[in-house]
Curated annotation (Swiss-Prot):
The keyword Ribosomal protein applies. This is Large ribosomal subunit protein uL15x. GO terms for molecular function: mRNA binding; structural constituent of ribosome. The keyword Iron does not apply. Belongs to the universal ribosomal protein uL15 family. InterPro entries: Ribosomal_uL15, Ribosomal_uL15/eL18, Ribosomal_uL15/eL18_sf, Ribosomal_uL15_CS. GO terms for biological process: translation. Residues 1-35 are annotated as: Disordered. It comes from Arabidopsis thaliana (Mouse-ear cress). Residues 1-14, 21-30 have a biased composition (Basic residues). Pfam families: Ribosomal_L27A (PF00828).
Length: 146
């Protein structure tokens, strides 16, 4: 349908443009800001801002996160942590040093067997008794770090 006037011309001459005689589209009919969020604006708050109102649980101050984080490595995997060039150079006098913390482990456990006649020094934060015994029997040594 064609019309002579564009929409914005239609209300020319009508003083308050449909916004009333006294208020004339002024002030704050719904309250200022977030007023009425629990009452007359509840639908808007529930739809677009869920969880804005209500309580949340307490915070735990000084919580020791990851207190018991202790990745482990077994004896049978230790020799595979040594680089190939270091393995080739190792002798009875020049034994390789394995720092398990650099590989992301904290504790060494005693599962498995060490390779024959291949002593080495193990550096770890924690070590089990059986692992320490097996390393020392193979001629190696254990260094504990903080």
């Amino acid at each position: 349908m064609t019309t002579r006037f564009k929409k914005n011309r239609k209300k020319r001459g009508h003083v308050s443009a449909g916004h009333g005689r006294i208020g004339k589209h002024r002030k704050h009919p719904g309250g200022r800001g977030n007023a009425g969020g629990m009452h007359h604006h509840r639908i808007l708050f529930d739809k677009y801002h869920p969880g804005y109102f209500g309580k949340v649980g307490m915070r735990y101050f000084h919580k020791l996160r990851n207190k018991f984080f202790c990745p482990i490595v077994n004896l049978d995997k230790l020799w595979s942590l040594v680089p190939e060039d270091v393995k080739a150079k190792s002798t009875k006098d020049n034994v390789p040093l394995i720092d398990v913390t650099q590989h992301g482990f904290f504790k060494v456990l005693g599962k498995g067997h060490l390779p024959e006649n291949k002593p080495f020094v193990v550096k770890a934060k924690l070590i089990s008794k059986t692992a320490e015994k097996k390393i020392k029997e193979a001629g190696g040594a254990v260094v504990l770090t903080a």
